[in-house]
UniProtKB/Swiss-Prot annotation:
Organism: Danio rerio (Zebrafish)
PROSITE patterns in the record: ANTISTASIN (PS51252), IGFBP_N_2 (PS51323), VWFC_1 (PS01208), VWFC_2 (PS50184)
TM spans (from-to): 932-952
Its job: May play a role in CNS development by interacting with growth factors implicated in motor neuron differentiation and survival.
Cystines in this chain: 31-54, 34-56, 39-57, 45-60, 68-84, 78-103
Entry protein name: Cysteine-rich motor neuron 1 protein
Amino acid sequence: MASSRMYLLVKCMLILQLMVLIAKNSRALICLPCDKSKCEEPKPCTGSVVLGICGCCSVCAKQKNESCGGVYGLYGTCDRGLRCVIRPPLNGGSITQYEVGNCEDENWDDDQLLGFEPCNENLVTGCNIIDGKCECDSVRTCNNPFEFASQEACQTALQKIEEERPDCSKARCEVQFSPRCPEDSILIEGYAPPGECCPLPSRCVCSPAGCLRKVCQPGHLNILVSKSSGKPGECCDLYECKPVFSVDCSTVECPPVKPVQCPADSYETQVRLTADGCCTLPTRCECLPGLCTFPQCSAGMSPQVMSRGDGTPGRCCDVFECVNETKPACTLNGVEYHDGDMFRMDACRFCRCQGGVSVCFTAQCGVLHCERYYVPDGECCPVCEDPIYPVLSLAGCYVNGQILAHGDHWREDDCTFCQCVSGDARCVAAACGHSCLNPVTVPGECCPVCEEPTYITMAPPACGSLDNCTLLEQSCAFGFRLDPSGCRTCACKSREELCGGLMASCTLKCPFGFQTDIHGCDVCQCRPRHKKCKAVACAKDCPFGYIKNKHGCDTCRCKKCPELPCDKACPMGFQHDELGCLICQCRDQSSSSVTPAVKLGSCLSMDGRRHENGQSWHDGCRDCYCHAGREMCALISCPVPPCDNPTIRPGHCCPTCPEESSSHKPELSEASVCLAPGGEYFVEGETWNIDSCTQCTCHSGRVLCETEVCPPLLCHSPIRTQDSCCPHCPDDPVTPQTPSNDSMPSYCRNEDGDIFLAAESWKPNVCSSCVCLDGAISCFSESCPPVNCARPVLRKGQCCPYCLDATPRAVCHFNGKTYMDEERWDIDSCTHCYCLQGQTLCSTVSCPALPCHQPLTVEGSCCPMCPESYAPTNVPIEKTDQRGDKSRHQPAWPTHSENDVMPQFRGEFGSLQMPYLDGKTPLPSEDAGLHWAWVALPVLMMMLTLAALLLVNQRKQWIPVPCYRTPNKSTCLNNQLVYVDCQKGTKVQVDSSQRMLRIADPDSRYSGYYSMQKHNNLQADNFYQTA
């Protein structure tokens, strides 16, 4: 029994020590829900009582010289009249507010109880470490905002931080969320302390600028009610204006107060009261905060101090004036350089012009870890070279529009040097080294240099003034001519004089000559090998030049973008404009993942590659072609996998089951002709719809089809119906929702380390879909249903093969011509024919008896008409057949007048069905009885009413068609209703989901409204009738 108790005691002690150890090394603070019944009464306190760090139980306030502060305030809060003072570190480091301090007196004076008075600002100079750099400045402020008094101390601390920086490549840090700070505090973002990889949590700290003090009226005192605790939300002291009842101001005589006029750089302080609250004290002037700034002068001007400021009103700031910059230039080998210009003296030495003095320094090279190296032409530092291997082939390399031989070297950019090895470009980066804290980047050079003077080339010449010279800078395109002493003269320099000194220090041997600059002067860069190209016979006008082929010769194709004259060194590349052309602006690292601007007419394939319009390629499984901005790929034939979770393996083309060892080889369509699965032939460039979901084009004898990208499916075993192009879930799919509380995870991470937000869905491959739910990834597989065709096809980007509807379309043959299904043609002005499902159907017009004795026969009209009723209102007709050909001719029906009649159809379709197999022209019917029209009138009126009710529910769109003279009566035939109003314009209402044959052009002389339900061209022919 005793041993078990001893064992339990030892176990408790070990657990207690472990908890103490964890508490010492942990930065976490766990506060349980407040239950004041469990709080212990604090022992008799020397001072006042304050709340603990969790804000629940009361504890004794810390007294003078006791510890306070620390992480989360674990060491307590100082009593009233005391403040927690944290001493700055001796090594010059920054204060993080997590250090432990001591309680000291606040040193409040009586003036603080009488009103607010701004402090006296002083000019303070110092430095802070911001983003790994020392940022120095001079500001006028009440408190010193700088951590280091000088740049030397800041650089020493920065170098120490770099030396103590740990290896954070394998560190795993928790995601830190920034809190929302009250109005009296500001947010301090978390940062990694010296020696640690993970940043501290962001926190809110009190901001004195957020505290406002009350100004009381005469007869009231500003009394301190409660002292700030130093915590966010309790940062400010609370004052109240209370009347002074103990003093009778009626007997007090106040001295006169003179008004104060402050200068423009200062302001008048607020009115203060005497201790009894009866009289006002004199005000004074104080410098305006944030007034002093450093001026920004225009080009060629520099700021010069005219008078120094001492911080007193009227002289708060230094007074500057922008004056002309007359710094002398530098001259080297006859070339003049302006102040601040950096130039290259030779391969390894650089110079900067500073006040007429050329300060030069030597480039520093890094250590190479290779056995073979070489020094590129015009460079100082060597670069590594590939070891010598047996030459497999002497193939050249095509680089930047020119062909380089095996073994040739070239410079890809400022930091990359390449060599052609057996047809492959082998590139290495230059190794840089420097021994200073702030190396300088030289434009056009890879390695930064240390700007430490090694020698002085020349002293600034004592040159006279050119005040009497009338020449301006822009008058001399090549600069001013220099005298033997290097001073400017009042004469312009010629191009020969400018170019004379540029090649003085050049050591390159260029077999094809040197390149030239904008002035036509030779520069120390070799010209590439001359290209043997034939003259291009091209009629195109290309403002940006021609596109070059693989041999570097011009082709008859225009460049879409101009050349980019830019000398910026952009490590992340350049930005694009709205046309996809490069502009001389560096791309930010944050925008490196943004999709670049797309050129007009290009295609973005499913593998993320960009192809130009008209370009062909092979994606490993099928031939593809960029057609009008759409990716068109060949349909391949694949068997349907019999499992529930098929997948397309890398390097394979057809879906397979996980247990299968081999992949089916896809069968491609015939490449000789464009033969669609429906048995139709198509010519080169023709586009058609193979079904409701697939649009195809004929390219190089291959049928290439476009497919749409299907969204993720959050269910198992989705189905594909005939009326849908993508599979869908048979039941309600999983509905992802964002987390409703903060305890639920807001993101998921997959095996590759990719992060997905809550409720986000995606497709890791074409056969599965995933979603992020409650911090975990749930995936669903697509199963392929069986098919009933011999050769199912597989679209690119989809998982399951399916069958195409290969039903051939019927055609009609008449008089040696072939007509497509639903095509219409005219035999003469009285006979119209149609092709319907392979059968030729024709209709004729029956002419009625006329009351006149001498009827007129109008050209293009079928039936004669009386002279008194003839009105020449014919309009030309535009016909469109199945081939897209258009022709304009006079109407094949009579000019409409009051005596016009509707063509009479007989037979199954309308009133007449006449299959013409021998090609003979039919004779018009002689049945012209008018009494049949009166017999059929009630029936037609009933059909009119029914058709009107049906047409109300149809989805229609309005298109303009020509009008004719309004008939006496309108009748209904084949669900077509005519409304005519020649005063309001002509429109026809048709179903927007089907094609409508355009039968005439608008005529502004007449107007009318037609409402008809369109089924096919056969019904479109019966579009009016009069009786």
